[in-house]
Amino acid sequence: MATENFLIELGTEELPPKALRKLAQAFADNFTAELDKAGLAHQGVQWFAAPRRLALKVAALADKQADKQVEKRGPAVSAAFDAAGNPTPAAAGWAKSNGIEVAQADRLATDKGEWLVYRANVAGQPTTGLLPAMAATALAGLPIPKPMRWGAKRTQFIRPVHTLCMLFGAELVDGEILGLRSARIIRGHRFMGEAQFEISHADQYPALLLEKGKVQADYETRKAFIKAGAEAAAQQLGGIADIEESLLEEVTSLVEWPVILTATFEEKFLAVPAEALVHTMKGDQKYFPVYDNNGKLLPNFIFVSNIESKDPAQIIQGNERVVRPRLSDAEFFFNTDKKHSLASRLESLDTVLFQQQLGTLKDKSVRIAEMSAFIAAQIGADVEHATRAGLLSKCDLMTNMVMEFTDTQGVMGMHYARHDHEAEDVAVALNEQYMPRFAGDNLPNGLVACAVAIADKLDTLAGIFGIGQAPKGDKDPFALRRAAIGTLRIIVEKQLDLDLVDVVSKAAELYDGKISNKSVVDEVVDFMLGRFRASYQEAGIAVDVIQAVLARRPTRPADFDARVKAVSHFRTLDAAEALAAANKRVSNILAKFDGKLKDSVDAALLQDPAEQVLAQQVAAMETKLAPLFANGEYQLALTELAALREAVDTFFDKVMVMADDEALKLNRLTLLARLQALFLQAADISLLQQ
């Protein structure tokens, strides 16, 4: 079967930069699915994306579908002919629908009887006739929240589309998509190269676009060029470029012909906290800041131009001119804000609602202060400093700097607290209270910061659940999922001895009657344990391991984590499968017994050697493992319990648990209950799958 490379390119208005990769990847995935559905063989789909185009290139695409044999079953032979042997209306109608006579039908014998069947070879359709509809379907499935119309057309897309090119090798694929007919026209860079040109073969893409149109359509090549160029430029400045992945992606999506340039700003602005300057450079201007080898911000930045100028100095000066007023604003806000202490802004928080039913940000700050003190006392942090940090935690929200540059909340609180001569761990806590801000983010360092970060998150969780506004579906306006997982990460990774029931109860109590949900503590704890489960699954922990631990509902996250790790390790042991099965058997036996078990095993009633051995080993394990369980050393404990496998197997092979003698039966059930209780101190391993 002959093959050719296939190209499709849509020339558009500027596409949303933050969505460009997602759109291109979805286009490739959708089109690949269409090819597979149509049974068209190929050797891979590559996507291209630039600000004004989306394109796909399919390698070695078959020129037609493979021929295939179809088989259409008709009525049963018994129903296909009447007593005289003539075709019934059912048989005649079926044959007509398939374009044959009844006599031309084959017969298919099955264990349920004989049936009429029509077999035919169907020739595969030419690929070029299928491609337009497949491409249209792939485009229709793109993640476009708000499609737009343009001109007098009724078609919709994320941005207006001006060109469509579909080539199967050298052949122009005839078809219409989004109101445009396919043509050989490709548009180049808006200001460089040829405005538009013709492409004669799919293999010429993207090289011809690069040569004639001055557009680097390969997204990954463009991204790598920008990253390497920015790093080299920073090195020439004697520094290191701050190339955040999300910003690199956005800049890559904004330019078709990247040109790396460096610029400077006045050193006087370095008196302003670096975070505020960086926010302006990254967030507003899409610049890459530069730091020296000690992590100090330099008065330089790197930016990416979308045009190769004969006079790059003009472009550099233009960017310096644009950023200067923003840096001046930051300088003004910083100097103005320092005239008033953070503490003096506490009262103004009373003018800002946290949530209508839950009070103001001042109310929240007071609760966080009390909650921080409660947590600090339990984890060995400075209670006075934790209280102070909690009280000041939201004061920077009332500063000019944070009102203008909202992403600087927390970090500006830290700088202002230092200016006010607050204790250093108080100042640091004001910044770190929001950590972790996203998956994989750093955690608070000091214990005071941990106390405030946990207090803030638990206050939000208890309050929002307390008024019955738990997250539903994808809607989570108060970021409760992030708050829950952040709290759990801090407790587990910092190994803090906190019980969720205790801290959530305290958080709910501090609302002092403002919340109406009486089951708020249970709901928040269950919600947090649910997030725990999800995070472990994402980390690759087996579901049955998580279920085995959840069955015990441990509410100390650090303890929960230790159990999960222990059960994961236990699951790898040779004895695990047999002991899990034995525990399941024990659970079933005990579940059917509705009487009262004895407090202890009566040695005099142990008749069979197998039950005597098991009783001795269980008693020995109870003594040996008590300190291990008390110290949370579950992995060591479960490893020791694996040694019971032989005794347990022999017991079930030799001993009739449900003996006719009531005393013997009760004694054996008590022995099994003690065996089960040993394992349950870690997890319910009966839930482990084979």
UniProtKB/Swiss-Prot annotation:
Enzyme class: ligase
Subcellular location: Cytoplasm
Keyword Cytoplasm in record: yes
Entry's EC annotation: 6.1.1.14
BP term (GO), one: arginyl-tRNA aminoacylation
Signal peptide, first to last residue: none
Gene Ontology cellular component terms for the protein in this record: cytosol
Keywords: Aminoacyl-tRNA synthetase, ATP-binding, Cytoplasm, Ligase, Nucleotide-binding, Protein biosynthesis
Keyword ATP-binding: yes
Catalytically driven reaction(s): tRNA(Gly) + glycine + ATP = glycyl-tRNA(Gly) + AMP + diphosphate
InterPro entries: DALR_anticod-bd (IPR008909), Gly-tRNA-synth_bsu (IPR015944), Gly-tRNA-synth_heterodimer (IPR006194)
Top-level division of the source organism's lineage: Bacteria
Record GO terms (molecular function): arginine-tRNA ligase activity; ATP binding; glycine-tRNA ligase activity
Stated family: Belongs to the class-II aminoacyl-tRNA synthetase family.
NCBIfam families, per the entry: glyS
The protein's assembly and partners: Tetramer of two alpha and two beta subunits.
Protein name (database record): Glycine--tRNA ligase beta subunit
